[in-house]
Amino acid sequence: MANLKEIRAKVTSIQSTQKITRAMQMVAASKMRRAQERMEVGRPYADSMRRVISHLVHASSDYKHPYMVSRPVNRVGYIVITSDRGLAGGLNINLFKALSKNIQKYQEQSVQAEFAVIGAKGVSFFKSFGGKVTSAVTDYGDKPTFEQINAPVQAMLDDYTNGKIDRIYVVYNKFVNAMTQKPTVNQLVPLPESAFGEEESGIQTELSWDYIYEPDIKTLIDELLGRYIESIVYQAVMENIASEQSSRMVAMKAATDNAGDLINDLQLVYNKLRQAAITREISEIVGGAAAVS
């Protein structure tokens, strides 16, 4: 059994670690709130863009953008969004499990897959377990611009436009609340019909007016669809950042609480040993006094 000096050293070491985890918990909580604000600010933009595109799509039944045309699937692409740093609980592991489940469905059909990765943890995962990574970006920070993450996204979209890929998914952790993050695999292109669903189409049939398009409706659809796809990916990145910080906050709180429990257990052992040592010393003194007398 450890002596009193060793137990005191362990308690001191755990207390130092507890201070670190508590500080990390507080930092993660602050970053989560800011990330959540940025995430919520972006949602109205994507929703407004979707409504405008829906109007254009239903106003022009003759033109179909490649992003809206389904074709037989021989190869799929995944834009995988992970964190750059660890200490975030099971956030990335759960995401990789959801991704693997989706990939398995296509592997059973002999469909090949390739990956564009955003985040250092994703790069490490594919280095360890394999997978064709066509492009990657890391160190995007807590407040990335779209230019920072654009390269792998654009490379994947170019492959889709050129017919090298027949379907693209975006994989990320959806922020539900501070305690819950949901691993999500959403089809990006071709855009599912639900993206411009019955609500918008119903509205269009009721309207007797239309826009005046400059230079023409095809050019507008091409431009706006590209920006809409970009907004979806960027929003997914912001959701993942908020999820990362909330998961790290919860993980660090659990670590802080566990450290407290461990300190209490060690303190109890320390007190018992100290009491036993005092009792032993008293017994020795009493025994010595009795022998002298």
Curated annotation (Swiss-Prot):
GO term, biological process aspect, one: proton motive force-driven plasma membrane ATP synthesis
Subcellular location field: Cell inner membrane
GO molecular function: ATP binding; proton-transporting ATP synthase activity, rotational mechanism
Membrane topology classification: Peripheral membrane protein
One Pfam family here: ATP-synt
Keyword S-adenosyl-L-methionine found: no
One GO cellular component term noted in the UniProt record for this chain: proton-transporting ATP synthase complex
The entry's keywords: ATP synthesis, Cell inner membrane, Cell membrane, CF(1), Hydrogen ion transport, Ion transport, Membrane, Transport
Main location: membrane
Subunit structure: F-type ATPases have 2 components, CF(1) - the catalytic core - and CF(0) - the membrane proton channel. CF(1) has five subunits: alpha(3), beta(3), gamma(1), delta(1), epsilon(1). CF(0) has three main subunits: a, b and c.
Family assignment from sequence similarity: Belongs to the ATPase gamma chain family.
Record function comment: Produces ATP from ADP in the presence of a proton gradient across the membrane. The gamma chain is believed to be important in regulating ATPase activity and the flow of protons through the CF(0) complex.
Protein name, as recorded: ATP synthase gamma chain
